Amino acid sequence: MKQNYDNPLRRQCFDLVRLAPAQFDLAREALLRLEPEKRLAHIRRVIVTGCGDSYLAAAEAREVFKHYLRGTGCRMEAVRAIKAARYLPLDENASDTLLIAISASGGPARIAEILQRGKRHGCLTMALTNNGASRAGTTADLAYVTNTPEFPDRMPGLRSYLASMMGLFVLATVLGEVKSGKTGLCDELRAELEAYNGRFAAALDQMDDSAYAAACAMKDSKGFEVCADGPLFSCGEFISAKYAEVSGDKCTVVDSENFWHVNSIMMPQNAYGTIDYVVSDERNCERMAQTISGQVEKLGRKVLVVADKPAAELGVTAPVMECILPVPAPQFRFLLPLYAFVPGSLVAGYHTALIEEPYFRGGGKFFDPSINTLGTNEIRVL
């Protein structure tokens, strides 16, 4: 019975539809306190970085920045933390650059290093964090605090991931207003979010049923894989991380083309539970349908298709499990990453409950500071 396998990841997923609109409002209030019209008007380059899930939040915000900064002469780029710290070229006086480092805790050494490097090069630095008093929050010129409400069993952090994305989405609209002189962009996005949030909430029980059925069917898999293209690739990386954190399973991430170059030859070929993400009106739909059909017909895999339409309507010719995911209209498709990770996270949560594995292997070595040096690694400001 599904109710016997309720789990912390599932409870976080179900709370997200309550959290999302509230988190938007909290982010907006926090950002306006930083006086963006005065502090951000000169910005022409926005660099957003972070470690782990925080980088993925940055990657998932690319499209919303692209939408709201179009025609302003300002551009956004999302880069991984080690690149921002050690490899990314910065001018000696990059005063027109806003460097944003994301960390919910604000504690990682690499985040502090990035902020110090940004200051050395004349950037305006911002910490997007849930802890303004942290090392990141006190190192940055600006502490953009998410103020995410407390929640029981909040690890691993789906809520902090949503909060980081929401903070960036709000920043994109406000910066768009500042740079373009337009008004109402933030209000427009808030209204679209509210509408999409309602559609997603109405479908959540059905997605939960689909996720439980898929987890049961895939329970004995040797490993897992997420196949997704375009912006949803980062969603796949997030789901992969959840499997590692909650059940300790390896979960690879691949796009529909590279699957046939590499991952299709992983052995045993039928041993990997697979979650495929598809959107019916996007240009890669046909290729995704071909890949999904091949995963089942040629490799014998158990496959869950997460899409906005039944698999047969996408062109899938093989029998698969299905999870219907509402998607926003094309002009606001950039909202999809705020929720797309939920079906895969539900499957990971149920899988972990079914095999009775403690999250993070019960602690132990994962939290040993002599092994996990995220907060103590040497800082080198280049």
Task: Report the location of each language-model feature.
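Conserved phosphate/anionic-ligand binding catalytic regions in large, soluble enzymes, centered on
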Residues: D6-L9, V48, S54-A61, G236-E245, ...
